[in-house]
Amino acid sequence: MLTLVAKCLSKLGISLVYSYLCTIKENDMQKHTSIQLFRYEPTEGVAEYHAMLRITNPKLTYAEQVESLLAAYDQLLRTELAGTVAVFKRWFLSDAANQANYLLATQVEQSDCALSIIEQPPLDGTKIALWVYLQKGVQTRTLSHGDYEVSHGGYRHIWSASNFNQASKSEYQTRLLLNDYIMRLAEQNCTLANNCIRTWFFVQNVDVNYGGVVKARNEVFLTQNLTEHTHFIASTGIAGRHASHEVLVQMDAYAVAGLQQEQIHYLYAPTHLNPTYEYGVSFERGTYIDYGDRRQVFISGTASINNRGEIMYPGDIRKQTLRMWENVETLLAEAECTFDHVGHLIVYLRDISDYAVVQEMFEERFPTIPKVYLQAPVCRPGWLIEMECMAVKAIHNDNYKPY
């Protein structure tokens, strides 16, 4: 039925965007995996896909869960998503110290894109989950420092994943991470201020180490002319662990070369949120980029906050979830988007006992959007929940090259 609808819309010149549950059951391992898939398929140009793969049987061993996900992903590429390439993967693990090396060994033959591996335990009781961002109609290559380039339409999209070092403090690690990234961008004739669109900072023991991340980021950003008078970068700063206990901060990032500065817009939602610099941090609430044929939206990690920077509904997970949705919805609306344009949701919870309530709420409101629920305390202890997302919407703008 979906294929028939797609063909009919294609004849009318309408881009197809939809999300649905795709369960592949080819062998005994694949039957333990569920796949939620979002498709953005314009009649011309690059198609975009978000896939969220999760295990349905938590009793499987870790090796069996990995095998099941890999088999289902391979089958997905050979069937539903034939002809696509992955541009970014993030693996969510329950115990990175005991799991990451095994997973990396399986990826040697599948190192086809930027690869992020982080300990953020799936809250459904399984050991591993996978988010994949895929595209069709692009050229890809690995850059000298391991970053991953996706090119098409006169743009170069640079994905960087699993960056870390082992300096003695979170502040020093963050400063080294950012300075190294700035140098890598310079090799691609890019800058942090003009080209970096999105960052993720995963912080071990976030209640203790996040302050060092904030201090270093503020100081480095100042040297790059990223201030309250210019702009910052959309970001998530959340709990997450590397396999090594000595790694206090891990960073992923996304940059685009070839943009005009007029294509980049920042989201504020001042009726609901305040500028982050007012409480001492430096990131944008969200960013959208206009191309000739589409608008891409990147919503930062967003919690239950008001426009005075205060935590809304302390201790009440239901009300915090509702306020968080309202905040994200307002940011999306500023980009002339709705949740119908969202490709995936990542939901972070501090307290695992809130999972049943939150999962029920999300499944009722967003049954088909690809999503994953993770144990990952937010940067401020009073925030019980946080979420992030990406969205895409068809537009037409003759001032810019198509995506």
Q: Where do the PLM segments sit?
A:
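N-terminal presequence-like segments and the immediate start of the first folded domain
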Residues: 20, 25-343, 348-403
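Intrinsically disordered, low-complexity, charge-rich segments with an acidic bias
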Residues: 12-13, 379
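Short, positively charged and aromatic/hydrophobic N-terminal segments
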Residues: 3, 11, 17-25
